């Protein structure tokens, strides 16, 4: 395990990592590398807080399961029973959607629908805005017909828990999950950085170097707390793993019936060729906050977490009484994939001798094959030369535009060109460029992954002028859900 961690750190040049393993109920090994903030001199420890991101979802599900045990709600309760003002786009879905549906990604919405109200940070969207926005997000598929990952319904789940429990979500999570399990260092809601033993800063690459982006003095209570807002150190995450592998470590915390419900396959998930090739997997499904599959004939319960500059993985192998946690504070998706796979194979197929180098090469071959097949890489128009857009040629597009859930944006002359600016998400601002006969936005403070096409439809046939957006890179993070936006022109540009 130590060699695998070292190999991943060396190959990907990581600024730091925290990894721990539990076997037979005991913490057997800790591997800590690097600094909480690159160049800061403070080493990563078992108490250093990392954003666990979507590994929060299993904690939210556990909170709800505790409330089911307490008789405060039932999994098949209509959401509207607890949140009377809750609305989805279709009335029949509003009536039928149950508490369980909030946790299993079966809403019919597209992947990451509404995530632009959560990221990039900071922005001015509130938890109430996010929930109200669901009434305006048009589904891509029928309710309960297929899997598509979402975050916003976990935010709704947090509010259901708050309504049933009579206290804010963060208070309940601390009381019902952190305190009884001894996860005393974990943080959710608003908290002071000075009150934590150590806090890992997210890192991004700048000119070939890792640059830390530390928190301010106070970490605010963010709308996405129930979907991905928890921070924990490695020690506390290993306590989380221990109680799932051995309920005897937390007697009475959760009934056997609810433990079974959480780890039941509620929603089939599409299984990739990689899962078949690497792991000989036969199924893939979502439980309540957990992903369920098999690796080399062994059951695996796991989840990952991804936020800008923070990646995590929690993997449980219950039949082997083993599990491990990976915490990263850099944009290191491939590093997480490679290390998680390598460590899992140490348990499920130790005789195969799979190494970090093996999976690094496998990912490279996979990418090369996808590029050759034309299923990966930027399309031709995204690679075309770019030039500043001309305001005169965009006259009909200039003005103020409004989307019913995202709010107002402006497309207006500025600095000798044209700028796109969001009123509520200030980092979604940048110059408008022309490329391949189309227009796009190159956001000032975001990477090329965030670039977005702007497509204009003039007024006609009784319909107003409309502005829509789309990802320039089809492989970009689905949380840039531009495709869910539909702007209508509401006014002229204000002279600067």
Name what the model sees in each region.
Residues 1-50, 72-74, 88-89, 132-137:
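Short, conserved catalytic-motif segment at the N-terminal edge
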Residues 13-16, 308-311, 405:
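Short, small/polar residue-rich loop motifs at catalytic or cofactor-binding pockets
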Residues 313-316, 320-329, 466-469:
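Short, well-ordered beta-strand elements
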Residues 74-90, 181:
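Short, glycine/proline-biased beta-turn/loop segments that scaffold the active-site neighborhood
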Residues 2-5, 19, 25, 49-79, ...:
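Active-site SXXK
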Residues 33-37, 91-308, 313:
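Short, surface-exposed loop or secondary-structure junction motifs
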Residues 322-353:
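Contiguous hydrophobic, core-forming segments of folded domains
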Residues 298, 341-496:
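Peripheral terminal and inter-domain segments
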């Amino acid at each position: 395990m130590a060699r695998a961690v070292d190999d991943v750190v060396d190959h990907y040049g990581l600024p730091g990592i925290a990894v721990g393993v539990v076997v037979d109920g005991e913490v057997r090994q800790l591997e800590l590398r690097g600094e909480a903030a690159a160049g800061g001199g403070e080493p990563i420890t078992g108490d250093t807080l990392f954003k666990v991101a979507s590994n929060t979802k299993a904690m939210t599900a556990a909170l709800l399961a505790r409330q089911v045990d307490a008789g405060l709600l039932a999994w098949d309760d209509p959401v509207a029973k607890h949140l009377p003002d809750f609305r989805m786009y279709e009335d029949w879905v509003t009536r039928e959607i149950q508490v369980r549906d909030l946790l299993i990604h079966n809403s019919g919405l597209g992947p990451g629908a509404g995530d632009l109200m959560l990221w990039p940070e900071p922005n001015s969207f509130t938890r109430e805005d996010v929930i109200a926005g669901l009434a305006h997000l048009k589904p891509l598929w029928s309710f309960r017909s297929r899997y598509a990952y979402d975050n916003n319904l976990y935010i709704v789940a947090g509010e259901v828990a708050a309504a049933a429990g009579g206290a804010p979500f963060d208070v309940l999570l601390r009381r019902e999950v952190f305190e009884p399990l001894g996860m005393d260092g974990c943080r959710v809601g608003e908290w002071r950085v000075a009150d934590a033993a150590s806090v890992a800063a997210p890192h991004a690459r700048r000119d070939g170097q890792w640059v830390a982006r530390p928190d301010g003095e106070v970490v605010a209570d963010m709308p996405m707390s129930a979907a991905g807002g928890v921070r924990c150190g490695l020690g506390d995450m290993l306590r989380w793993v221990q109680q799932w592998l051995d309920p005897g470590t937390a007697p009475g915390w959760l009934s056997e019936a609810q433990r079974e419900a959480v780890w039941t396959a509620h929603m089939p998930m599409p299984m990739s060729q990689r899962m078949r090739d690497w792991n000989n997997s036969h199924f893939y499904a979502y439980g309540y906050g957990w992903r369920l599959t098999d690796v080399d004939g062994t059951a695996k319960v796991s989840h990952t977490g991804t936020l800008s500059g923070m990646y995590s993985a929690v993997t449980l192998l219950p039949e082997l009484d083993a599990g491990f946690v990976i915490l990263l504070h850099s944009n290191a998706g491939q590093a997480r994939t490679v290390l998680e796979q390598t460590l899992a194979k140490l348990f499920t197929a130790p005789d195969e001798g799979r190494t970090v180098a093996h999976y690094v090469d496998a990912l490279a071959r996979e990418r090369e094959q996808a590029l050759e097949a034309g299923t990966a890489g930027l399309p031709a128009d995204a690679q075309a030369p770019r030039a500043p857009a001309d305001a005169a040629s965009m006259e009909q597009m200039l003005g103020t535009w409004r989307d019913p859930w995202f709010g107002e944006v402006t497309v207006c002359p500025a600095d000798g060109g044209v700028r796109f600016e969001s009123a509520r998400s200030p980092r979604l601002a940048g110059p408008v460029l022309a490329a391949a006969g189309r227009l796009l936005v190159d956001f000032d403070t975001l990477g090329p992954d965030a670039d977005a096409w702007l497509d204009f439809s003039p007024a006609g046939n009784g319909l107003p002028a409309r502005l829509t957006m789309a990802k320039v890179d089809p492989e970009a993070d689905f949380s840039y859900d531009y495709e869910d936006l539909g702007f209508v022109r509401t006014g002229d540009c204000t002279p600067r």
